Curated annotation (Swiss-Prot):
NCBIfam families: rplP_bact
Keyword NADP: no
GO molecular function: rRNA binding; structural constituent of ribosome; tRNA binding
GO annotation, biological process: translation
Full protein name: Large ribosomal subunit protein uL16
HAMAP family recorded: Ribosomal_uL16
Length: 136
């Protein structure tokens, strides 16, 4: 699973997920999966979608993951009273704004890419859309 090797601080404020995304263009591959909605992806969801795509394209072509879970999410154990500090880090998430390209693919046909991205999108909690590289 993806997570940072080192961080400056162990825990992070909750924060807000506002604004528009950077990384809105398909830059590495020919096809991409772009987020339409706003939310957050856990490292497990990112990995599950990657596995679904990789299995569908049967090791042909190449996949790029354009998101990285760099925000720690903490939680307190069950049946623990309030107070006594912030809980332990349970998992890592990546905050997603609308327009962010999540995955890219190259070396496969458009039909196969659409099918693979549809399988990946079913694993994600966001609305997504299929995009192609724009050549100028």
């Amino acid at each position: 699973m993806l997570q940072p090797k080192r961080t400056k601080f162990r825990k992070m404020f909750k924060g807000r997920n506002r604004g528009l995304a950077n990384g809105t263009e398909v830059s590495f591959g020919d096809f991409g999966l772009k987020a339409v909605g706003r939310g957050r992806l856990t490292a497990r969801q990112i990995e599950a979608a990657r596995r679904a795509m990789t299995r569908h394209i049967k090791r042909q072509g190449q996949i790029w993951i354009r998101v990285f879970p760099d925000k720690p999410i903490t939680s307190k154990p069950l049946e623990v009273r309030m107070g006594k500090g912030k809980g332990n880090v349970e998992y890592w998430v990546c905050q997603i704004q609308p327009g962010k390209v999540l995955y890219e693919m190259d070396g496969v046909t458009e039909e196969l890419a659409r099918e693979a991205f549809a399988l990946a999108a079913a694993k994600l909690p966001l609305k997504t859309t299929f995009v192609t590289k724009t050549v100028m």
